[in-house]
UniProtKB/Swiss-Prot annotation:
Pfam families: G3P_acyltransf (PF02660)
Key words, A-Z: Cell membrane, Lipid biosynthesis, Lipid metabolism, Membrane, Phospholipid biosynthesis, Phospholipid metabolism, Transferase, Transmembrane, Transmembrane helix
Highest taxon of source: Bacteria
Protein's UniProt name: Glycerol-3-phosphate acyltransferase
Length: 202
C-alpha cells in the first residue's frame, strides 16, 4: 500500500504546473493562452521572460530530482521482483514525468517532459546528465531548436543506458523518448516546414 501511495505522491508532485503558477502569481497571465500554449519551461521563457523561465526550469527539474529519493525516505519495503521494480528511483521518477506531462490540476494538459526528465536523471546518474546536457546545448547552439535538441538528447539517453547496462534506465528512457516525440510532434512538423521558432538567446 505504501508503494502505491509513494507513486501517487510522485505523480502529484510532478503534476505541479510550475509555468502556470509562476505566470498567474507574478504576471497575472495564463501561460496556456500565449505562445505554444504549453506550460513548460520553453514556453515560459518565451512568454514570461528569462528570470521566470529559469525559475520554471529549476522547479520542473527539482520535481523530477526530489521524487527519485522517495524509496529511501519513505517506509516502503521491496519483498519481490515486482515491488523491487516499483521502488526503483527511476520508476518513481517516471510517475513524476507522467504527472508533468498529464497534470490532473490542469485537465491533463502539461509540459513536454524535458526538464522533469532531466531532474530524474540528475538524481540517479549525474554524470550521464552532464553528457546529455552537453549534447543538448551543443545541438541547440547549432540549430537553435529546443525541440530538436530535446529529441536528440533523449535518443542519446537510450544509447547511454545500453552502454552502461542500466536496463531499467533503458526501459524508462525509451518510454520517455516516445512520450517526448509525441509531445513534440507539432514541433517536428514545423521544423520540416521551416516554421519552428528558433531561440534568440544563444
Amino acid at each position: 500500500m505504501m508503494i502505491v501511495i509513494m507513486l501517487i505522491l510522485s505523480y502529484l508532485i510532478g503534476a505541479f504546473p510550475s509555468g502556470y503558477v509562476i505566470g498567474k502569481l507574478f504576471f497575472k497571465k495564463d501561460i496556456r493562452q500565449f505562445g505554444s500554449g504549453n506550460t513548460g519551461a520553453t514556453n515560459s521563457f518565451r512568454v514570461l521572460g528569462k528570470p521566470a523561465g529559469f525559475l520554471v526550469t529549476f522547479l520542473d527539474i527539482f520535481k523530477g530530482f526530489i521524487v527519485v529519493f522517495f524509496p529511501l525516505w519513505l517506509p516502503v519495503q521491496a519483498e519481490g521482483p515486482i515491488t523491487t521494480f516499483f521502488t526503483n528511483g527511476l520508476i518513481v521518477g517516471a510517475f513524476a514525468i507522467l504527472g508533468h506531462v498529464y497534470p490532473v490540476y490542469l485537465g491533463f494538459k502539461g509540459g513536454k517532459a524535458v526538464a522533469t526528465s532531466a531532474g530524474v536523471i540528475l538524481g540517479v546518474n549525474p554524470v550521464l546528465l552532464l553528457i546529455l546536457a552537453a549534447i543538448f546545448f551543443g545541438i541547440l547552439y547549432l540549430t537553435k531548436y529546443v525541440s530538436l535538441s530535446s529529441i536528440i538528447a533523449s535518443i542519446c539517453c537510450v544509447i547511454g543506458a545500453l552502454l552502461i547496462r542500466d536496463y531499467i534506465l533503458f526501459i524508462v528512457s525509451i518510454g520517455v523518448g516516445v512520450l517526448l516525440i509525441i509531445r513534440h510532434r507539432t514541433n517536428i512538423v514545423r521544423i520540416f516546414k521551416g516554421e519552428e521558432p528558433k531561440i534568440k538567446w544563444m
